[in-house]
Amino acid sequence: MTVALVLHRADGAPLSTSFRRAAFGKNDPFARNREIAWEGPDSMIAGRVSLVGEHRIASFPHIETIVVVEGELTLETAGQAPLVLGPGAGAVVGCGTALRMSAESRTRFVFCAAACKRPTKTGLAPLRADADFKPTATLPADVLLGPAPECRSDNAFTEDDVEYKAGTWDSTPYHRIVRPHRMNEFMHLLAGGVRFAAPDGSVLSMGAGDALFVPQGAPIGWESSERVAKFYVVQSVHASTGRD
């Protein structure tokens, strides 16, 4: 079973992740440029896109969280100030959004997208490192190998139809056992470092500027020795809808 898929390394180190060029649905605006690392039965994908130039989309066909890792990307929609995203900046594009997207030079972003048949949220939701953090639940004692952390989050976007949430999260250091991941999760680390443990004892070390995706059910542990902050996308998957 896949434990974690590395989508980007800030230091430019080569990736072992396999990407395939493919569109996400018949109306994908990035069909020629999309590289998919993971696609689940729950209509969620994660990967990367490289592009240059201008793209005008009358109605964005899905939900997509974008975090720029190289270059600069400008997102514009009616009724909102333009968002200019440089490396480490991100935003969520709601399904159905009329969007103008432009990049004057080659730009790359990592993404986590999901299909949505009954969208309720359109527009752009910026992701912010200096988020309005609020305390959130810590981890249960039976999965911790040490003191319980203090966790905070700021949820910037929610689409209830597909249980898709995106925002910013941070935590004090903690050590957690290897266990099945409770949801699909995209992470772009903003600060700190994490050692993700696999059942075979191997460890994947990730730091600020790195991005990865962990599928629901993948067995994985967490160990951090400093404050960690990240942009996240999470999605719960249910067997009743063919998602598990």
Please report, for each region that a protein language model flagged, where it lies by residue.
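Short, conserved beta-strand element in jelly-roll/cupin
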Residues: F60-T74, P180-F196
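Surface-exposed beta-loop interaction hotspot
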Residues: M101-D160
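Ligand-binding loop in jelly-roll beta-barrel domains
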Residues: C95-T120, Q216-S240
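Ordered, small/hydrophobic-rich secondary-structure cores
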Residues: M1-A91
